[in-house]
């Protein structure tokens, strides 16, 4: 297959980063004026992940119709997707209002609520303990009917009720729970098995509204999911499956939402998934059983919230190159700590968060084409960290040490100055008396 040869050639030449940069430069750019309005600032998770004006989803609200979501219509594939950010605490009601108004049957979630100790998404669906959630701002009620937990994904059956009309609808929530915090899945097997589960449910069928797909920013993992699905669909529809050009398909999708596919690693993984998925499209039905076997979906799932590893304690008076900290100027140590923060393997997804704790700068293996975070701070801010109770801060200790060191010298200088001034005055007085 031509695509497989292309993949091997790119792998051999190590040119994934260059190809990814070409896509970034060729991608369409359209206005995002509505997203930038001051009143919508608290509805965006990231400053620089915004829906284009021409493709944004509009809520049926009179006061404000804005939600950070984009409609992607792939006409040849006859597939539509709504790509959106992970809901914020203040936009959960808007999220379900969009699902209701767009008549969507499926929601695909590709992140965990917490990753790397950061909140990636609000808990916008009810858990077993509570069973239901009511969104008063949009007058909707969501009830958990059942959930099927596998080793790497969970399928939830939800009931969404419009409290104004008393109408109810079934919503299927497909939650991929094991996308690694750093990078992409090792193998496309589990990803493809998950994708085909979504397909088999009918949630992607045109008789329903567009499937809603999200991660944290709604561009990286979400773009990977939609790109793989669209390419496999085009392979199935065309007489010549090898004519499908992944790069062209991605550029077409980027006309509807910015930044789809965030890293070269995600682009490479998309190729892998399409190449492997094409085996099923070409008639090898046994590969689906292989995906299921390789993905180990019947094993015990990992915990939902994995606490981040503790950060090492900061050094206070430890030796540094054979010398102690107290003999160095304080600002040198502050700079060192700030640099340590920068060197930590932090990642993620585009822009400074507005409504959540800062998300790290994602490496070339996660959702991060433009997302960034400010690490450290000004020197003054670093020195202003509160000391332990009852113990003076490090700058205060240094000041006391410096004062005790210079005190004898300063006293001697003062005495010498007074004696010199006195001698001069006596000389002037005696000189004037003689004249």
Curated annotation (Swiss-Prot):
Localization, UniProt: Endoplasmic reticulum membrane
Pfam families in alphabetical order: Y_phosphatase (PF00102)
Catalytic activity: O-phospho-L-tyrosyl-[protein] + H2O = L-tyrosyl-[protein] + phosphate
UniProt topology in membrane: Peripheral membrane protein
Binding-site list for substrate: 181, 215-221, 262
Disulfide bonds: none
Composition-biased stretches (Basic and acidic residues): 338-351
Active site positions: 215 (phosphocysteine intermediate)
Residue numbers bearing the Cysteine persulfide modification: 215
Sites of Phosphotyrosine modification: 20, 66
Cellular component aspect of the GO annotation: cytoplasm; cytoplasmic side of endoplasmic reticulum membrane; cytosol; early endosome; endoplasmic reticulum; endosome lumen; glutamatergic synapse; mitochondrial crista
The Tyrosine-protein phosphatase domain, residue ranges: 3-277
Enzyme class: hydrolase
Keywords annotated in UniProt: Acetylation, Endoplasmic reticulum, Hydrolase, Membrane, Oxidation, Phosphoprotein, Protein phosphatase, S-nitrosylation
Gene Ontology terms, MF aspect: cadherin binding; enzyme binding; ephrin receptor binding; insulin receptor binding; non-membrane spanning protein tyrosine phosphatase activity; protein kinase binding; protein phosphatase 2A binding; protein tyrosine phosphatase activity
Region (Disordered): 338-359, 378-398
Tissues where the protein occurs: Expressed in keratinocytes (at protein level).
Quaternary structure and partners: Interacts with EPHA3 (phosphorylated); dephosphorylates EPHA3 and may regulate its trafficking and function. Interacts with MET. Interacts with NCK1.
Name of the protein: Tyrosine-protein phosphatase non-receptor type 1
Species whose genome carries this gene: Homo sapiens (Human)
Phylogenetic lineage: Eukaryota, Metazoa, Chordata, Craniata, Vertebrata
């Amino acid at each position: 297959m031509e695509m497989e040869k292309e993949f091997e050639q790119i792998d051999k030449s190590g040119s994934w980063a260059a190809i990814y940069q070409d896509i970034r430069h060729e991608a369409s750019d359209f206005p995002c004026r509505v997203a930038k309005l001051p009143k919508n600032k608290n509805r965006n998770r990231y400053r620089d992940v915004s829906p284009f004006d021409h493709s944004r989803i509009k809520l049926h609200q009179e006061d404000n119709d804005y939600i950070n979501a984009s409609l992607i219509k792939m006409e040849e594939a006859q597939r539509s997707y709504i790509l959106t950010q992970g809901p914020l605490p203040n936009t959960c009601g808007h999220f379900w209002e969009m699902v209701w108004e767009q008549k969507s049957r499926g929601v695909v979630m590709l992140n965990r609520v917490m990753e790397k100790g950061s909140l990636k998404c609000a808990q916008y669906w009810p858990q077993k303990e509570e069973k239901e959630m009511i969104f008063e701002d949009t007058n909707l009620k969501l009830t958990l009917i059942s959930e099927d937990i596998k080793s790497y994904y969970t399928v939830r059956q939800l009931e969404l009720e419009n409290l104004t009309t008393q109408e109810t609808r079934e919503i299927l929530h497909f939650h991929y729970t094991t996308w690694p915090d750093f990078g992409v899945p090792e193998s496309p097997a589990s990803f493809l098995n998950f994708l085909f589960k979504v397909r088999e449910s009918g949630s992607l069928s045109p008789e329903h509204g567009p499937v809603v797909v999200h991660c944290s920013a709604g561009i990286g993992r979400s773009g990977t999911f939609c790109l793989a699905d669209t390419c496999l669909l085009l392979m199935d529809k065309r007489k010549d499956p090898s004519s499908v050009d992944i790069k062209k398909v991605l550029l077409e999708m980027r006309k509807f939402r910015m930044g789809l596919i965030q890293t070269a690693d995600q682009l490479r993984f998309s190729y892998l998934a399409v190449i492997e998925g094409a085996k099923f499209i070409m008639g090898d039905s046994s590969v689906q059983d292989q995906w299921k076997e390789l993905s180990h979906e019947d094993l015990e799932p990992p915990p939902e919230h994995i606490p981040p590893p503790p950060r090492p304690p900061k050094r206070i008076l430890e030796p540094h190159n054979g010398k102690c900290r107290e003999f160095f100027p304080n600002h040198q140590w502050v700079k060192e700590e700030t640099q340590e923060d920068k060197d930590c393997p932090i990642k993620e997804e585009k822009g400074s968060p507005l409504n959540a704790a800062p998300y790290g700068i994602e490496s070339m293996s996660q959702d991060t084409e433009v997302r960034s975070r400010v690490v450290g701070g000004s020197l003054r801010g670093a020195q202003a960290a509160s000391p332990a109770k009852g113990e003076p801060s490090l700058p205060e200790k240094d000041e006391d040490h410096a004062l005790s060191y210079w005190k004898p010298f300063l006293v001697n200088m003062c005495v010498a100055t007074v004696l010199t001034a006195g001698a001069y005055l006596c000389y002037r007085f005696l000189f004037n008396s003689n004249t």
